[in-house]
């Protein structure tokens, strides 16, 4: 990757073709638990937020209400692409954003469409992102955002 490319664009280049990310949270028992989720973004903007559709009545929504700190890992061994991001998750109630991101693939899980009452749009505001640089055999930090006090 070129060093003059903005970090959010580099991140998108690394994950855009990886169908599933492993979304990891701390469950009610305090254990780390991972779920395969499909990233709904069409790009990653400077705000560095990733979006996922999840069932409103499921474990993920309950868990992030208790602990919003999550991580998402992406891997494509065929492309030597390994990415880890972490941030704060929340349910985004923006119906226009749901409409924008809803796809035929999402309809398989939420047949009533983007207005399905059980459809929750999960927004993960990234605080940290890094990837494995295969050529140099090391982790490379894409960005680290300071948390607001």
Model-derived features: where do they sit?
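Charged, gly/pro-rich active-site loop segments
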Residues: 1-3, 85-149
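Charged, amphipathic alpha-helical segments
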Residues: 4-8, 54-58, 106-107
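A short, Trp-centered hydrophobic/proline-enriched beta-strand micro-motif
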Residues: 13-30, 70-74
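General beta-strand recognition
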Residues: 22, 49-51, 130
């Amino acid at each position: 990757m070129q060093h003059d490319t903005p970090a959010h664009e580099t991140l998108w280049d690394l994950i855009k073709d990886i169908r599933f990310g492993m979304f990891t949270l701390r469950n009610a028992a305090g254990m780390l638990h991972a779920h395969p989720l499909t990233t709904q973004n069409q790009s990653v903007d400077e705000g560095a937020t990733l979006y996922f559709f999840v069932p409103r009545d499921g474990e993920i929504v309950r868990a992030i209400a208790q602990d919003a700190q999550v991580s998402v890992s992406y891997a494509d061994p065929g492309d030597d692409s390994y990415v880890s991001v972490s941030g704060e998750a929340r349910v985004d109630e923006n119906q226009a954003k749901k409409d924008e991101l809803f796809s035929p693939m999402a309809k398989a899980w939420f047949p009533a469409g983007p207005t399905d009452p059980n459809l929750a749009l999960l927004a993960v505001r990234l605080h940290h992102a890094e990837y494995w640089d295969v050529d140099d055999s090391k982790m490379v930090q894409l960005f680290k955002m300071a948390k607001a006090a």
